Amino acid sequence: MAKVGKLTKLKSAMKKWPSFAKNHHHSTSSAAVSDELSEDNNLHVVYVGQTRRPYMLRPDIISHPLFQELVDRSSSRSIEQDREIVVACEVVLFEHLLWMLKSGQEGGSVEELAEFYTY
């Protein structure tokens, strides 16, 4: 009987999935808005992972040596277009990296950490 309940929950989640994906789709107009926001707030758009998830980052994060090493390693694996900053890193790991940089809990050498975070 427990399997039936799990299957029902799974079906329910699968039905909601398409509407969830539609709500989180970025259009070119939203990209233009994010460009305007980045200019106004001095934030930079960074695209992370294979899905190219956008992040708005402050200049102090962008200029950090570890972040610069990630961008350098990523640029050899991806094609940069129109000044876009692309980081070849899993999104979950990138969020951990941001937490480390913001909290000042960086440990280890820049090269070792960059190798850990990039794919």
From Swiss-Prot:
Gene Ontology BP, a term: ethylene-activated signaling pathway
Keyword Mitochondrion: no
InterPro entries: SAUR_fam (IPR003676)
One Pfam family from the record: Auxin_inducible
Record's keyword terms, sorted: Developmental protein, Ethylene signaling pathway, Growth regulation
Keyword hit for 4Fe-4S: no
Disulfide bridge partners, by residue number: none
Job of this protein: May be involved in the regulation of ethylene receptor signaling. Promotes cell expansion and plant growth.
PANTHER family: EXPRESSED PROTEIN, SMALL AUXIN-UP RNA-RELATED
Family classification: Belongs to the ARG7 family.
Other noteworthy facts: Plants silencing SAUR78 exhibit increased sensitivity to ethylene, while plants over-expressing SAUR78 display reduced ethylene sensitivity. Plants over-expressing SAUR78 exhibit increased rosette diameters.
Protein name as catalogued: Auxin-responsive protein SAUR78
Organism: Arabidopsis thaliana (Mouse-ear cress)
Lineage: Eukaryota, Viridiplantae, Streptophyta, Embryophyta, Tracheophyta
